[in-house]
């Protein structure tokens, strides 16, 4: 102690630094760097927090970035490009973070990080109201042409005019009917979709068969023709639906001659029933190539000796589907037999029917593969098109391949929308389509794969139970519900409106059973309410459904000819129609340039569709109010709220199930407690089952990505799988992250073939010669695959336990 009263203290602090530092050793260098950064970040955050508490409020907010001013209406407008319509004052910046974002809840952001379209929509010419185009596939004037002048009998012509209300033929019918009525040469029939190709070849066949028993004026002859008189014509079609439709059209025509019989033989039906119908007798047979080949090999009562016509409808499609060998077999068996001049009853066929077998090949698109089909089936064929000028030109140049465009009265549009906005844009388009009563009665949505069709059907259908039908008055038998359409037809939700409170939803694809497919297509055709059909390319060929006014290509076709057939489901027989194509920003926008177009395809951005579709409230299932609740009444807010609703609906646990784990740590902790190898995992009853809709969404996503990679080689420059953002595309299926296993497919185990001397006893004991037994080919359960899996799982579990339970042992914290 000093004299002046002051006190001096000496502290010994040692040689260690004042600030304690932590050094990480061991493990990978990436993990050490991450741990050091995390330690440093934690210290910096604590320092900043303490500094912020000491500072005044004014000083604290001085360093913050300036916030953008919120507009009064809260409308976000378009964020990548400003819309062409509307005043500039109505265009606002992106919406500010909602309260859900501030409180830590999940919010689905759709209008951020989207790719910029290549097309400059600002420089596109303003669309002008053009005069309605003259229909290119409409019937001709009744004063100029009629069926009687084309060479058809009076009986057939009167039946078409009075019963079927067909006063005049179309252009392709005008050029085809006289050729097939008077000549016996093969025909190469080509015309655009919806132009009446089916009747163009059916009417001459019916006319000439009818001439066996009736004169031109309709008076009967002495000879009689009935179902046992012989098989005169075979019509091949690629799909069962097209066969059914051809049969429906032919049955309407044959009402003028009820003694003539037609039938179908298609896959999915009972072969026993088909053989019974053939045994009773049939004059015109409509078949798919595979089933007809089966009957030619196994059905002895099927006699093709009297066959005079072989029609190949949609010949290019049959070649694409791999029916080349079947067609060769069919043509070979028909030509191998001797052409009978008289039938079994002694009726002379020559002079009335063709003296040779006539082959007719027809389609809307004739590609190069049809040349090969023509070499198989045609001999000196006449090329018939809708206009005489085309016929003369093809006769001079010998051209075979012609690119046919869509009907002239068809309006086409292409919507450029980012992957994240595809689903909500589709809902907005359908909602605006059915906003007015009577505006559109039926719409078809084409999707690339069956799994995606199933998912979108389950997503859009109403979850409320159907109302019981009203009881019938006394004396009337109650109508029985069709069990075949219970899973394929349902009322829709999200897309209804006060004007159309009921919109029926249908689904159709090739994986459904044939009775279900037929019943669904019939229900869609006969539906009196507004209806939507979600389908694959199975419905793109030849189907003629009345009142289809809108076709949506949600997934672009795999080839341009398929696109032509898709949009040909509308604007048929001179009626108006509209086709909409969904494209992603970027390389897909160039796809428009290679599409055949009789009318210009107008590209447009998604914002106009969202503004129109989400201008009013959206009806959603499972809520008390029945409508989608949003903080702000704008189309952008409704779009994001609808996307969030879809994601929450997929993640919702099943009734009575345990809550779904949200974080990865919770999932890992649950896996540690509940999974003890493969056998224990199978027996774990506490595992939460996934929502079936979530499982369907994941499978639909995987199938969609696989289908995206199957475009034809010439078009892959526009559909580049490597440029596809999987995370954004997952949003289009209501998923928050892209599921894995896209390229895995079905896992299969291969085994070495069992040698003749091997023993296949089910015991694992050695046989007498000392060799161990080898299991049977399908004996997967007896193979010892589980030992290696359990050992690997045990080692991985121990390593993960060491990492998660004791971090010091991994990094050797000092």
Curated annotation (Swiss-Prot):
UniProt short sequence motif DEAD box, positions renumbered to this chain: 313-316
PROSITE patterns noted in UniProt: HELICASE_ATP_BIND_1, HELICASE_CTER, Q_MOTIF
Catalytic activity annotation: ATP + H2O = ADP + phosphate + H(+)
GO-annotated molecular function: ATP binding; ATP hydrolysis activity; RNA binding; RNA helicase activity
All copies of domain Helicase ATP-binding, residue ranges: 178-384
Keywords for this protein: ATP-binding, Helicase, Hydrolase, Nucleotide-binding, Nucleus, Ribosome biogenesis, RNA-binding, rRNA processing
EC number: 3.6.4.13
GO biological process annotation, one example: ribosome biogenesis
SMART domains, sorted: DEXDc (SM00487), DUF4217 (SM01178), HELICc (SM00490)
UniProt binding sites for ATP: 191-198
GO cellular component terms listed in the entry, alphabetical order: nucleolus; nucleus
Primary localisation category: nucleus
Domain Helicase C-terminal: 422-622
Segments carrying motif Q motif: 145-174
Similarity comment: Belongs to the DEAD box helicase family. DDX31/DBP7 subfamily.
Function of the molecule: ATP-binding RNA helicase involved in the biogenesis of 60S ribosomal subunits and is required for the normal formation of 25S and 5.8S rRNAs.
Domain notes: The Q motif is unique to and characteristic of the DEAD box family of RNA helicases and controls ATP binding and hydrolysis.
Record protein name field: ATP-dependent RNA helicase dbp-7
Gene: dbp-7
């Amino acid at each position: 102690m000093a004299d002046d009263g002051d006190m001096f203290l000496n502290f010994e602090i040692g040689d260690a630094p004042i600030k304690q530092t932590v050094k990480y050793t061991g493990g990978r260098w990436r993990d050490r760097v991450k741990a050091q950064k995390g330690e440093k970040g934690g210290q910096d955050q604590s320092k900043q927090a303490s500094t912020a508490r000491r500072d005044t409020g004014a000083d604290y907010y001085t360093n913050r970035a300036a916030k953008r001013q919120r507009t009064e209406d809260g409308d976000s407008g378009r964020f990548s490009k400003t819309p062409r319509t509307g005043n500039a004052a109505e265009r606002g910046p992106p919406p500010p973070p909602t309260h859900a974002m501030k409180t830590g809840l999940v919010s689905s952001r759709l209008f951020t990080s989207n790719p910029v379209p290549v097309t400059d929509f600002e420089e596109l010419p303003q669309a002008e109201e053009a005069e309605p185009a003259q229909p290119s596939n409409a019937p001709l004037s009744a004063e100029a042409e009629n069926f009687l002048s084309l060479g058809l009998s009076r009986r057939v012509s009167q039946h078409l005019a009075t019963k079927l209300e067909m006063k005049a033929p179309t252009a392709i019918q005008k050029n085809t009917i006289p050729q097939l009525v008077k000549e016996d040469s093969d025909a190469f029939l080509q015309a655009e979709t919806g132009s009446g190709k089916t009747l163009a070849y059916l009417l001459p066949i019916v006319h000439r068969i009818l001439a066996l028993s009736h004169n031109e004026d309709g008076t009967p002859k002495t000879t009689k023709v009935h179902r046992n008189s012989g098989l005169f014509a075979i019509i091949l079609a690629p799909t069962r639906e097209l066969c059914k439709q051809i049969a429906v059209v032919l049955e309407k025509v044959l009402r003028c001659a009820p003694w003539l019989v037609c039938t179908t033989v298609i896959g999915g039906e009972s072969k026993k029933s088909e053989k019974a119908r053939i045994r009773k007798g049939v004059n015109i047979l409509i078949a798919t190539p595979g089933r007809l080949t089966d009957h030619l090999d196994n059905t002895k009562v099927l006699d093709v000796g009297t066959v005079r016509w072989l029609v190949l409808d949609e010949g290019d499609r049959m070649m694409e589907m791999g029916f080349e060998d079947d067609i060769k077999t069919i043509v070979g068996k028909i030509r191998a037999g001797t052409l009978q001049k008289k039938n079994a009853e002694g009726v002379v066929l020559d002079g009335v029917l063709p003296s040779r077998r006539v082959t007719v090949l027809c389609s809307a698109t004739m590609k190069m593969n049809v040349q090969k089909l023509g070499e198989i089936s045609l001999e000196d064929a006449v090329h018939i098109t809708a206009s005489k000028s085309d016929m003369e030109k093809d006769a001079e140049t010998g051209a075979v391949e012609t690119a046919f465009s869509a009907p002239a009265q068809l309006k086409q549009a292409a919507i450029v929308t980012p992957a994240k906005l595809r689903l909500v844009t589709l809902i907005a388009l359908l909602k605006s389509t059915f906003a007015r009563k009577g505006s559109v009665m039926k719409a078809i949505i084409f999707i690339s794969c069956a799994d995606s069709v199933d998912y979108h059907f389950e997503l859009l259908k109403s979850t409320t139970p159907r109302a019981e039908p009203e009881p019938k008055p006394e004396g009337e038998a109650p109508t029985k519900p069709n069990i075949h359409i219970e899973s394929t037809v349902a009322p829709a939700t999200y897309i209804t409106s006060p004007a159309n409170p009921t919109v029926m939803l249908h689904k159709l694809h090739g994986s459904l059973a044939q009775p279900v497919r037929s019943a669904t297509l019939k229900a869609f055709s006969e539906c009196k309410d507004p209806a939507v059909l979600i389908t694959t390319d199975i419905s793109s060929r030849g189907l003629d459904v009345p009142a289809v006014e809108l076709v949506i290509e949600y997934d672009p076709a795999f080839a341009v000819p398929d696109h032509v057939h898709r949009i040909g489901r509308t604007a048929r027989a001179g009626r108006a129609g509209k086709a909409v194509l969904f494209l992603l920003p970027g390389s897909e926008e160039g796809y428009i340039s290679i599409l055949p177009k009789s009318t210009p395809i107008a590209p447009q951005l998604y914002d106009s569709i969202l503004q129109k579709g989400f201008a009013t409230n959206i009806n959603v299932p499972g809520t008390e109010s029945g409508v989608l609740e949003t903080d702000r009444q704008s189309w952008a807010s409704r779009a994001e709220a609808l996307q969030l609703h879809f994601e929450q609906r997929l993640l919702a646990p099943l009734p009575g199930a345990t809550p779904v784990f949200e974080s990865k740590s919770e999932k890992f902790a649950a896996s540690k407690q509940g999974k003890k190898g493969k056998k224990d995992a199978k027996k774990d009853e506490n595992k939460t089952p996934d929502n079936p809709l979530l499982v369907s969404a994941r499978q639909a996503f995987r199938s969609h990505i696989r289908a995206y990679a199957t475009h034809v080689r010439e078009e892959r420059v526009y559909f580049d799988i490597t440029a596809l953002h999987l995370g954004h595309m997952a949003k289009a299926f209501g998923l928050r992250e892209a599921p894995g296993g896209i390229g895995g497919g079905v896992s299969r185990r291969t085994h070495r073939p069992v040698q003749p001397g091997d023993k296949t006893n089910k015991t694992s004991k050695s046989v007498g010669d000392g060799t161990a037994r080898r299991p049977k080919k399908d004996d997967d359960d007896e193979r010892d695959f589980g030992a290696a899996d359990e050992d690997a799982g045990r080692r991985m579990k121990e390593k993960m336990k060491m990492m998660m339970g004791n971090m010091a042992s991994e990094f050797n914290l000092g």
